[in-house]
């Protein structure tokens, strides 16, 4: 038998994306097979030469002279009226929780989106529960053994 890990990564924070559209993505990921080992979200990066960067410039969400860095993917470069940078960072942080926990737990996860004491405390609690319940691979394990 072969050992492998499968991941379902998403990109959030594209031009004009809203919280509701991000939850469409979350609900799509929730329907994927149970044997997906990990889910996550990365925040959209407006790389030069891409049509979405051109759209973001046209809409005034980014200036043409702004350069997208590979080293800073934890926050959005876009300044959009549809969703704030802080909300995007919070959603990216808890994306995996939304995809795995039952919907009845979503009010707790919403608290964990925040970067204040209450949010950090809730994230620590839910993160431990997530690891204990949903992690199927051991970090650093050699998948080739």
Give the location of each predicted region.
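Radical SAM enzyme core and accessory elements
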Residues: 50-56, 61-145
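Conserved C-terminal portion of the radical SAM core fold
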Residues: 1-50, 94-110
């Amino acid at each position: 038998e072969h050992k492998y890990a499968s991941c379902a990564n998403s990109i959030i924070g594209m031009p004009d994306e809203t919280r509701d559209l991000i939850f469409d993505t979350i609900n799509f990921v929730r329907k994927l097979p149970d044997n997906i080992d990990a889910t996550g979200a990365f925040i959209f990066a407006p790389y030069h030469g891409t049509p979405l960067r051109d759209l973001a410039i046209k809409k005034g969400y980014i200036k043409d002279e702004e350069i997208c860095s590979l080293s800073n993917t934890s926050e959005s470069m876009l300044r959009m009226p549809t969703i704030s940078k802080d909300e995007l960072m919070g959603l990216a942080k808890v994306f995996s929780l939304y995809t795995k926990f039952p919907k009845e737990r979503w009010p707790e996860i919403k608290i964990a989106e925040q970067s204040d004491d209450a949010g950090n405390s809730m994230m620590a609690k839910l993160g431990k529960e997530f690891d204990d319940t949903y992690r199927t691979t051991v970090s650093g394990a050699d998948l080739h053994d």
